[in-house]
Amino acid sequence: PEELAEKLTRVGLEVESVNYLGAGLEGVVTGKVTQIERHPNSDHLWICMMDYGSGEIVQILTGAQNVHQDDIVPVAVVGSQLPSGMKLKKAKMRGLDSFGMLCSAEELGIDAKLLLPEQRNGIFILPPDTPIGVDIKKVLGLDDVVLDIDLTANRGDCTNIIGLAREAAAVLGTEFRMPDMSVQETAGGNA
C-alpha cells in the first residue's frame, strides 16, 4: 500500500493517508462456544469452552449475558492484541482461569453506527455458518487498506473508481481490466 501511495503521489494524485482498517487487531479469531455453564462462585460470570480451530478446547470466562452454546464469536486468545492496545494474558476470575476473551464489536474497533441495534451490546455474535479459526479481520473485511486521495483539478480523469483503477494499473505496470457491469433481467423485470 505504501508503495502504491508513493507511486500515485509521483504522478500527481496526492495520497493524504494510508489507513489499515484492522490496525491494532492481532491474533483475534473466530471460535465456537462448545459448552457454557454458570461460574460456581459468581452469579454473573459464565464458563465457556471454546473451539477456535487450534485443535484444543480452551476455557474462557465472560460476564456477557448474550452468549449461548454453539454461538460463533470473536475470540481474543492469550497473546492477542485489541485496537485499544490491550494485550490478552491469562486471567483468574473468582478462582478459575480464563485463557482469553470473547469480544464485543466495540472491542474490535467497529463503530457502533455501522451495527444493527442488537449487535451493539454484549459479545458480537457472528452468523452460524462462519468458519472457526479464521482471523476476524478477514471475516469482517478489516484486512484491507484505504488510500485517502486528495484530487486536484488537473486530475479529472481520476474522479471515479475506474479512473483510479486505470491509474493504479499504470503506475504498477499491470493490466487494467474493465469489470463486467452487465445486468441480468429477472422474470418480473427487476434487476
Feature locations, PLM:
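Phosphate-backbone binding interfaces of nucleic-acid-interacting proteins
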Residues: 1-189
